[in-house]
Amino acid sequence: MRMLMRVKWLKAFLVATTAIMPLVAIGEGYAVAQTAQNRVPYHIPAQSLASSLSAFARASNYKIAYATSLTLGKMAPAIEGNYTAEDVLERLLSGSGLSYRFTGEKSVSIAAIGQQDAAFQAEGTTLLDTITVTGGQGIAAADAPYSTAAPTAYISEQTIERFRGSSPADIFRGTAGVMSAEARNGAGSIDVNIRGMQGMGRVKTTIDGAENAINIYQGYQGISNRTFVDPDLLAGVEIQKGSDAASSGIAGTVAMRTVEAGDIVKEGNRFGIRVKGGFGTNSSKPVGDTVAGYQVINKGYAGPKIDDPELPDYDSLFVPSVTSGEGTMNRPAFLQPTNGSGSIVAAMKDEQVELLAGYAYRKRGNYHAGKHGSAAQVNDRGPTSVCNTLSCQLNPDDPYNWMWYPQYMEHSGLTNYRAGEQVLNTQLETGSWLLKGKLKFGDGHSIQLGYTGFKSISGDRMASNLNGLGAQARQQSKTTDADIHTGTFKYRWNPEDNDVINLKSNLWVTRLEQRSPPAYGGSANAPSGFKSGPDLLTWGADISNESHFSTAYGDLDLTYGASYKLEDTAPSEGTRKWDTWLDLRDGKREEAAGYIKAGYKPVDWLTLNGGLRYSHMWSQDRSDPTVKLPELDYSTAAFREGGFSPSFGVTVEPIKGTQFYANYSSTLRAPSIMESVTAFSMNVNADTKSERSNNWELGVNLIEDNLFAGSDQTMVKLGYFNWDVQNYIAREWYRDPNKIYPGMRIINIDRARFSGLELSTRYELGGFSAELAANYYLNVEFCRTADSCEDKSLYADYSTNAVPPKYGIDLTLSQKLLEDALTLGGRISHVSSRAIGHGGATAQGMSQFIRLIEWEPYTLVDIFAEYKINDNYTASVRVENLTDQYYVDPLSLVQQPGPGRTFYASLTASF
């Protein structure tokens, strides 16, 4: 048993939480009389019955179970003063037609009068339908970050539903310090950036414990790191910022959980089904070879203006031309449905078996940009000289290296898309499958098999083909296809009344294929409809156990385990033969690790943490040097590297609801498969070393009830981070004097540094809720050498477009009305300019090989309304980008705008 004082402290934190979870069993025969007679101060205003019961649970530390439908449309009177639990329940339920029953020392159930006895079988299993459990002995997942001594965050299913955006990447908006890159050209994928670090395995992203990540070559613009999922099948997203001994993610871990049988089957039922359907607006059907934006052709000649009397009309021969795309400005009406989605999930659940099957489908055409902002324009600069050649950049003092234009037309704006214009190649069609089966044995044993499938058809194009303000976008006739299949096996052993065994083991495999049309046409002899791309096979396994020991000298918690992962990537059949220039990576990478974490609590207010991880990586390059250019270094390379990653921390809890923590870690990341295997124009560097990130995390958590008003709840999480990444792995442009062709290679720079502040808060009063998330970067810098640190990203490096905004602020508000049946809300998001500058290409004497994607500060407003028609049906509407802003997303590889104002409506049925 845990020490009594520890239990008291845990209860103090749990008072301030509201947990919504299935109630599996409630026993009878508890000694509850004395507990029920204890007097507690209450400050509960007159409000809906559901809100009053939540306030009662927080103040009394009771867990209340009831059917959601029982409280719809019911109000409760104000409660002010010191009362027993019985007194409060009597007053709240007076005249409601409901009664209560104590089912444990700190638990109570509510049912219709006369139905309490029928609600329980002899063995105490509840038969109520949709159960809401409020307060008591569990912390809701959305509340957990506010009592976790680490920089964590959680995105709930409710938040995903309300603010899902036009791409899965949009679900991370509103999370301090976290964004997803390539939101508009990512083929419906997720590429998570945590505090300025992303890609190459720096952020470990899983779905039900399995990875389906793939790296996509984007020409000179770098790579995309893609994970695929449909938001309709997600039940929540847990985020750990920074390293953890149990994870390979040096910058953090994103663990997405898909729906389980318990999320679908209502309490007391054996079967359940959930059906969703909806539509959206602001999109148009793609038409092949359509062009958008402006095409400007300026005509001039080298050298200064010719002023010769014998050629008086010479300049009149150089008249520029300006044309614009046709058929892309016909934006549909605001409420005209132009895209749709639907999903169905069915499940069965009993004491031994859980089964679930789900399918989700969505289809959208090309979205339209907003109208208010820096859209494309063409300005007449008149007669002018322009330095737009390499010769001029190298020798600007020679006037004959300049170009003279009698009339020069210049693009302006953020992109080459006009206000409200159709953004080409942004269409997306996806289908997702989900299967799960779980078998529970005696003594806490269980096994679970799972399968997820995902297929997408998108207008995704190679990013290097879409850049340049003067480039006119063209709708490609061929699409990019992704096909992912993942299988999982999970074993759990968690016997009751055993604090030493909580065993978890997982085995998973993912097969991922992506096919794209040849970027530059490919071979003329290629088969009709030929597409090329990478094939990736990934295996993973892990095992861990948690043990708790109570001693006379304090409590000790241990977590220990091991993991293994194999990645094997190769070009698809025909890629080297028909996609004449593209040489994709061909190799494999393995990584094994073991770890142990310990938490020691000598007294109630102090916790000491420590951890140690050892990891080892092997990689093998299978590239064939005879296939492409023998002048380049395609030599087969093998990497082998490993090391230890220690961590420690301290947590102090001086008073109820207040927690201070300080954590330090020194974590190793070996080169990823992208960094250790050769590809087109990118050479392996045998001298590449592992990154080591030395991270400091300082933070405070506050949870307080009745701070500003009776029965309110306030939660605050404030943190400071300082990351120093030694031997940061980057990419550079270089020319080997022994080779004919220049190229790019992976290198280690001295270090990269990231530091900043993060704030997350939530305030609840009755049916009102306000959440604020903000982050501010104090420092971002890259140091090529120890004495050459700059607050600029490096020329030709992948990090060019991974630098986040200087700061971001998100405010989310919601209010329940009509006895909690109606919820109105919205979110205001402000994104600042880029945190730092960018190193110039001229410093290298070469052209720009990664174009910096620029954006301007912008503010987006999203609103929503949800109406619970009854216990089975919920209708929702939402408007995203309410003010129709024209903006460019940060962390993109292409210079194109995000979606303009879009209306969505949906209906969810649950039985």
What are the roles of these predicted feature ranges?
Residues 53, 59, 113-161, 169, ...:
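Short, acidic, small-residue-rich periplasmic hinge/interaction motif at the N-terminus
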Residues 227-276, 910:
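A beta-strand signature from Gram-negative outer-membrane beta-barrel systems
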Residues 493, 502-518, 653-655, 659-665, ...:
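Membrane-embedded beta-barrel scaffold of Gram-negative outer-membrane proteins
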